[in-house]
């Protein structure tokens, strides 16, 4: 029986681990990030992958820094035939990558060489792509740069969010891995080198990227809102207060107005001018210190005026 070590951390990784178990591989160990404090009460919380591994009685390693010798030697001591990673969250050292008989392969949520990095799902939507996918490739020390083994495309729908696409890609990754591993073991795959001229990056989202830039086109603002839903959530400011924007709709704007200006107030939301003739009607938001709500609820208690400028005094 093929001995596998799985390395992963978030919810995205769980279906991949589950599929390895269902397919009958001997998952001899799981490597995941350390437990972290979560929420206002800072409750020490295990990763989703750790929770899944413990359900199946699989030993769990939680290195703070996998590149340290005493940490990676614990992985090597398991003597896996194959290592599978999916959103592990740390750079894996060569000592691990070169050890298994069948190598170390990664399940990545983009069609490499596009969108290397830690936030490929967010960027696929923020960039307005109509499709993305899963790549399974050999791991190297350079970020997501290994030779490609298999790929599958996944359509991005018009109203897709990072949350819904995350779920689709997670399942697609598990399914593709299920088909890839037997072919890899049988020596039936021809690795393909990535074209370095086509490389783009999707680095982790920074706080300053979350703010809506109303000078962009309506389509770009709409994609920005979808791409940051349900985390970390796009935001703007209204009357100097931070407001998270959970959802908006593209609408035509007939009269010219400065980008970021409220040009219409309707029952289910208010329309904001952008950098072109497509405005964005905010329909779901979250004022600072309050719960997420529909814009119609918000408008019952707050009455912004037409001409009010959003995005100032952030």
Swiss-Prot record:
GO terms for cellular component: cytosol. Pfam families: Formyl_trans_C, Formyl_trans_N. GO terms for molecular function: methionyl-tRNA formyltransferase activity. It is an enzyme of class 2 (transferase). It catalyses: L-methionyl-tRNA(fMet) + (6R)-10-formyltetrahydrofolate = N-formyl-L-methionyl-tRNA(fMet) + (6S)-5,6,7,8-tetrahydrofolate + H(+). (6S)-5,6,7,8-tetrahydrofolate binds at residues 110-113. Gene3D superfamilies: Formyl transferase, C-terminal domain (3.10.25.10), Formyl transferase, N-terminal domain (3.40.50.170). It comes from the Bacteria. PROSITE patterns: GART. Its EC number is 2.1.2.9. Keywords: Protein biosynthesis, Transferase. Attaches a formyl group to the free amino group of methionyl-tRNA(fMet). The formyl group appears to play a dual role in the initiator identity of N-formylmethionyl-tRNA by promoting its recognition by IF2 and preventing the misappropriation of this tRNA by the elongation apparatus. Belongs to the Fmt family. NCBIfam families: fmt. This is Methionyl-tRNA formyltransferase. The lineage of its organism: Bacteria, Bacillati, Bacillota, Bacilli, Bacillales. The gene is fmt.
């Amino acid at each position: 029986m093929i001995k596998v070590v799985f390395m992963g951390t978030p919810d995205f990784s769980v279906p991949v681990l589950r599929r390895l178990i269902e397919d009958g591989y001997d998952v001899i160990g799981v490597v995941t990030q350390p437990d972290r404090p979560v929420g206002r009460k800072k409750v020490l919380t295990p990763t989703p992958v750790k929770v899944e591994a413990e359900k199946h009685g699989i030993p769990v390693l939680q290195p703070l820094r996998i590149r340290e010798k005493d940490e990676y030697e614990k992985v090597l001591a398991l003597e896996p035939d194959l290592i599978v990673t999916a959103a592990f969250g740390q750079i894996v050292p060569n000592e691990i990558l070169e050890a298994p008989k069948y190598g170390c392969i990664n399940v990545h949520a983009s069609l490499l060489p596009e969108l290397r990095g830690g936030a490929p799902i967010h960027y696929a939507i923020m960039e307005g792509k109509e499709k993305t996918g899963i790549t399974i490739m050999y791991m190297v020390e350079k970020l997501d740069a290994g030779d490609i083994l298999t790929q599958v495309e996944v359509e991005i729908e018009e109203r897709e969010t990072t949350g819904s696409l995350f779920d689709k890609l997670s399942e697609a990754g598990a399914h593709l891995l299920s088909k890839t591993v037997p072919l890899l073991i049988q020596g039936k795959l021809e690795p393909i080198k990535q074209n370095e001229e086509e490389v783009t990056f999707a680095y982790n989202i920074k706080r300053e990227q979350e703010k809506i830039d109303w000078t962009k086109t309506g389509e770009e603002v709409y994609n920005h809102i979808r791409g940051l839903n349900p985390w970390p959530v796009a935001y703007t400011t209204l009357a100097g207060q931070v407001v998270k924007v959970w959802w908006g709709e593209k609408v035509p704007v007939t009269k010219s107005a400065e980008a970021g200006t409220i040009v219409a107030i309707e029952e289910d939301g208010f329309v904001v001018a952008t950098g072109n003739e497509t405005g964005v009607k905010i329909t779901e938001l979250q004022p600072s210190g309050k719960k997420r709500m529909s814009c119609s609820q918000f408008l019952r208690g707050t009455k912004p005026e037409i001409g009010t400028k959003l995005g100032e005094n952030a």
